[in-house]
Amino acid sequence: MSVHPTLRFLATALVALGAGAALAQDAPRLTGADRPMSEVAAPPLPETITDDRRVGRNYPEQPPVIPHSIEGYQLSVNANRCLECHRRQYSGLVAAPMISITHFQDREGQMLADVSPRRYFCTACHVPQTNAQPLVTNEFRDMLTLMPASNEAE
């Protein structure tokens, strides 16, 4: 039985392509020494600063950082542990700063009797202060350091 030369060529080409695909699976990775899904130990979490001192802000409208640990705080649709101290009626009892008046405004600027739902989840903007080292060099400069001295006299 004779096989047509075209079929023989196609069969050989398919075998060669299959072998090439199998070899391509073992191609060197471009991501370095570790395989992409390898298990690597996570670095330790940075220590939370818990001195309860307010930290200065670097720019207007910067959300203040949280100067205490919030580990274990419940923050869900049903409960917000932050409001137990920072809500208007409780802040004086525990010497905690009251949440900003802007947290009582809706999108249109209308004042509400309680915290606006869009401001309810505190950790969307506020984070605990830690002693973590920056991952990149911080080149932020305050606006006052960028202004020429001649503008300050005006």
From Swiss-Prot:
Disulfide bridges in this chain: none
Post-translational modification summary for this protein: Binds 2 heme C groups per subunit.
Q: Does the keyword Iron apply?
A: yes
Q: What is its main location?
A: periplasm
Disruption of the gene: reported phenotype = Deletion mutants show reduced nitrate reductase activity.
Q: Name where it's found.
A: Periplasm
The entry lists its GO molecular-function terms as: metal ion binding
- Function comment: Electron transfer subunit of the periplasmic nitrate reductase complex NapAB. Receives electrons from the membrane-anchored tetraheme c-type NapC protein and transfers these to NapA subunit, thus allowing electron flow between membrane and periplasm. Essential for periplasmic nitrate reduction with nitrate as the terminal electron acceptor.
Keyword Heme attached: yes
- InterPro entries reported in the protein's UniProt record: Multihaem_cyt_sf, NapB
**Keyword field:** Electron transport, Heme, Iron, Metal-binding, Periplasm, Plasmid, Pyrrolidone carboxylic acid, Signal, Transport
List of residues binding heme c 2: 103, 122, 125-126
- Annotated heme c 1 binding lies at 68, 82, 85-86
Signal peptide region: 1-24
GO cellular component terms attached to this protein's record: periplasmic space
Record-linked PROSITE patterns: MULTIHEME_CYTC
- Induction section of the entry: Induced by nitrate. Not repressed by ammonium or oxygen.
Q: Which GO terms describe its biological process?
A: anaerobic respiration
Per the similarity annotation, which family is this? Belongs to the NapB family.
Q: Which residues carry this modification: Pyrrolidone carboxylic acid?
A: 25
Listed name of the protein: Periplasmic nitrate reductase, electron transfer subunit
